[in-house]
Regions:
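Hydrophobic alpha-helical transmembrane segments
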Residues: 1-75, 79-80, 84-86, 92, ...
């Protein structure tokens, strides 16, 4: 049982390494971290009910997933070529659009929750 638990915990290592790498290299992710901390602090100050915490958690998670996937796609595209390529530009733009939509939904929900 202990060996299984240790193996499971070790399996999360690459995920945490990836998050750390993205945080160190992506200014937008640092902005999302600051926003996450600010919204969490505001929620604690306002003593939000559980359902509002659930909404905030979903929105925060959505933004983080979108930003991490965008970062991974950008790095993969840059690995393929650093030259101007129309299809790669489109892939990067689409991924950035996903982050924009996720962020807009999160901001809208934050206004609905805190106002």
């Amino acid at each position: 049982m202990v060996a299984w638990l240790a193996r499971v915990l070790r399996s999360f290592g690459p995920a945490f390494t990836g998050i750390g790498t993205a945080l160190r290299s992506q200014p937008n992710l640092q902005i999302h971290l600051a926003a996450t901390l600010a919204v969490t602090t505001l929620g604690l100050i306002q003593n939000l009910p559980a359902w509002k915490w659930g909404c905030l958690g979903l929105c925060i998670g959505l933004v983080w997933v979108a930003e991490l996937l965008n970062t991974a796609l950008e790095k993969l595209c840059d690995r393929i070529t650093l030259e101007q390529d129309e299809q790669i530009r489109q892939v990067k733009d689409i991924a950035a659009g996903a982050v924009l939509i996720a962020s807009a939904v999160a901001v809208f929900m934050a206004f609905m929750i805190f106002l």
